[in-house]
Amino acid sequence: MIVSASRRSDIPAFYAEWMVRRLKEGFCTITNPFNRTQVTTISLKPEYVDAIVFWTRNPRPLMPYLDELDSRGYRYYFQFTILGYPRELDPKSPAAANTAETFGELAERLGSRRVIWRYDPIIFTGITTPAFHEENFQPL
């Protein structure tokens, strides 16, 4: 089973301690977003988890726990979004310069095949025009 953690809520950035507790306890419960009464228990034991995909804009809060994930036998990689959007659109993400530094640290530790850079979503507004994206993308 592949655990997608999580495109909806950025678990590494905001819920790292919760995720590590779930892995230690070996399970989590998931509520069906279309039927709130349907709750499923998912085993998170390493023998049942083929890989964990961490979707994040800020992996730094999870990084202190990576040795523990390794020692427990979890296989994982990061889909790492770096955008550099203006604060009006993305107030909770670290600055692009900081995330680029974190990306380098994570790639050094895990290897380039386990840290995938993403530039999305691409949003067009009066502030983030096509020209903004061309200029913003270059230094990243």
Each PLM stretch: what is its role?
Residues 44, 95-98:
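Generic, well-ordered alpha-helical segments
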Residues 1-89, 105, 110:
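Conserved Radical SAM active-site core
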